[in-house]
Structures are given as C-alpha cells and as structure tokens.
C-alpha cells in the first residue's frame, strides 16, 4: 500500500515494509531449504577404467548403459522413463556407478572414446540397444538388462535383485 506523506512533495511511504521484508526472508528460506534437499543427479562417466575403479573403491555396482543416445528410440525412452526420474537418481547415488557407452550417429565423439566403447561392446557381446550391463566391483558381470515397461520402480527392483544376488 502506498501513502503520500505530504500533498505535493511527491514522497511516498511503503506501508508494511517490515512485513514485506519478513515475507522475502521466509521465501528465501524456503527456496534454500528446498534447493539444498534436492539431491544432485548422479554423474554418468564415459571412462571405463575410471568407472570400474570408482565402483571398486566405493563398493557399488557399475551400470554400463550401451546406448545410441541420438537415434535409438528405446534408448531415449529408457532415459526418459527411468534414468531421468528422481527415484532412479536417488537409488543410483546410493548404489551405483553409472557409465554411458554411447554409439551416436549424429554427435561427434572422440576417437579414443569410440574405440573404448567398441571394445566394450565386443567384450560383452552387445547385440542391440539399449543393453545395460551390471558389473560388481571386481568387474565381473552379474546381470544384463534392457528396456522394460514399468518405469524406474520396475527397473530399480530388477537392479536390487542383481545387487542382492
């Protein structure tokens, strides 16, 4: 609410400045609280040796996503329905090291990365996309998944079966 202090002097007073500041402070506190409670998205590594080492030292499983990120419809669907969901990100932060072995058609890719991904695809006999390989900390394959209906909840349940052996 604006109130003129004196006729003709052009000065105005904002009534309730104290309340306005209180509201701003409360809003800032809420934004900070919400922002700090959101867990960071897990990092998708591309270096196999680094990912394997991290899985071993952190005692987590290594999930390797063999994907055609810019052309494979099922890969894009898996990313949209599973990997981008908060419940998967939460699960991954606690239990997985994530690695993407991408086989793009339109995106440029470093020669060394392309070679590494091709060697991994041969090693794990990848026949199609998406293929998800799950390895233990010692690099032993404990499971293989692909796209499945049911979203993040179903996918996490399958990962839990593999994790618990």
Language-model features: locations:
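A short beta-strand-turn-helix
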Residues: 44-62, 92
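Thiol-based oxidoreductase modules, predominantly thioredoxin-like and allied folds used
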Residues: 44-45, 85-115
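Sec/Tat signal peptide C-region and signal peptidase I cleavage site
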Residues: 36-41
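Non-catalytic, surface beta->alpha helical segment in thiol-disulfide oxidoreductase systems
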Residues: 81, 119, 123-165
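Bacterial N-terminal signal peptides that target proteins for export
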Residues: 4, 12-25
């Amino acid at each position: 609410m604006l109130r003129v202090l004196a006729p003709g002097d052009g000065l105005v007073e904002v009534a309730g400045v104290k309340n306005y500041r209180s509201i701003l402070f409360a809003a800032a506190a809420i934004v900070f609280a919400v922002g700090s409670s959101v867990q960071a998205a897990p990092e998708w590594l591309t270096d196999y040796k680094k990912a394997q080492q991290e899985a071993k030292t952190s005692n987590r499983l290594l999930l390797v996503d063999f994907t055609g990120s810019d052309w494979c419809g099922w890969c894009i669907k898996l990313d949209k329905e599973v990997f981008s969901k908060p419940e998967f990100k939460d699960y991954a932060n606690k239990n997985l090291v994530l690695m993407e072995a991408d086989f793009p058609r339109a995106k440029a890719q470093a020669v060394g990365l392309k070679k590494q991904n091709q060697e991994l695809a041969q090693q794990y006999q990848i026949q199609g996309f998406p293929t998800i390989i799950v390895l233990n900390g010692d690099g032993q394959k404990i499971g293989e998944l692909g796209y499945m209906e049911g979203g993040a909840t179903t996918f996490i349940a399958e990962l839990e079966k593999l994790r618990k052996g």
